[in-house]
């Protein structure tokens, strides 16, 4: 207990009660002194007391001196001892916590080091080690074969179309091929129209002439309209009109 409240209580007590309290305190002091003296003769002071015990004894002595050696000294020693015990226990708990934290940190680091890295996902295709610019899987190999076939077909078309070898680029080559095919289509249509006109004129001329003028030479339209293998060369060199006049002239010469 704190000595200050006990002193205040003594000041407010009546005079006769105060004398009685002083007498009782003297008796208790004498008894405690006699006990202490007897005990001092029997017990030896501990030489192996630590610094904490020395501090505790100092606190107890100072509290006893401030209390005036009264009966409240024994009561004031108990709270101080109780205060020091929780302080010691809290220090021990803190040290245990720090040790546990360091142990857990070391164990977590060791677990991270011992943990094996995750395996990479397996690929559906077999990876082939190839040079730079070469395909490494089946899909790219098939695409490469398809592109090679397309390039071969383009080369064949370039050889067929005159002047297409000078063009660079697949798009421009295809444009040249399309234009050439369209021009051939127009030429074929024009030639078919001319042939129809020639056939109509020839049929009208045959009907106008009498049959006795021809004699024994029958007119064969198939022979008159036969095409020589040199006609394609002549068409490439000259115009279509010249070729038609040439064919018509040959047909009339054979008829006559």
Curated annotation (Swiss-Prot):
Residues 134-147 are annotated as: Basic motif. It is found in: Nucleus. SUPFAM superfamilies: HLH, helix-loop-helix DNA-binding domain. GO terms for cellular component: nucleus. Residues 134-184 form the bHLH domain. GO terms for biological process: regulation of DNA-templated transcription. Residues 79-97 have a biased composition (Basic and acidic residues). PANTHER family: STEROL REGULATORY ELEMENT-BINDING PROTEIN (PTHR12565), TRANSCRIPTION FACTOR BHLH089 (PTHR12565:SF321). Interacts with RSS3. Forms a ternary complex with RSS3 and TIFY11A/JAZ9 in the nucleus. This is Transcription factor BHLH094. It comes from Oryza sativa subsp. japonica.
């Amino acid at each position: 207990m704190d000595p200050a409240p006990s002193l205040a209580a003594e000041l407010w007590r009546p005079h006769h009660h105060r004398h009685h309290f002083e007498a009782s305190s003297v008796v208790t002091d004498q008894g405690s002194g006699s006990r202490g003296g007897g005990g001092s003769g029997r017990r030896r002071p501990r030489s192996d007391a630590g610094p904490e015990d020395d501090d505790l004894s100092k606190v107890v002595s100072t509290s006893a001196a401030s209390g005036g050696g009264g009966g409240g000294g024994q009561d004031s020693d108990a709270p101080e001892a109780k205060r020091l015990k929780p302080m010691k226990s809290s220090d021990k708990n803190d040290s245990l916590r720090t040790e546990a934290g360091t142990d857990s940190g070391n164990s977590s680091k060791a677990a991270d080091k011992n943990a094996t890295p995750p395996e990479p996902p397996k690929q559906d295709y077999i990876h082939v080690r190839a040079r730079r610019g070469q395909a490494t899987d089946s899909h790219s190999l098939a695409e490469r074969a398809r592109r090679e076939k397309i390039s071969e077909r383009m080369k064949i078309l370039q050889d067929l179309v005159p002047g297409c070898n000078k063009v660079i680029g697949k798009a421009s080559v295809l444009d040249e091929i399309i234009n050439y095919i369209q021009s051939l289509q127009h030429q074929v249509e024009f030639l078919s129209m001319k042939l129809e006109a020639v056939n109509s004129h020839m049929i009208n001329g045959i009907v106008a002439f009498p049959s006795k003028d021809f004699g024994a030479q029958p007119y064969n339209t198939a022979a008159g309209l036969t095409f020589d293998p040199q006609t394609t060369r002549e068409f490439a060199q000259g115009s279509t009109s010249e070729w038609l006049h040439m064919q018509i002239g040959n047909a009339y010469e054979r008829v006559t």
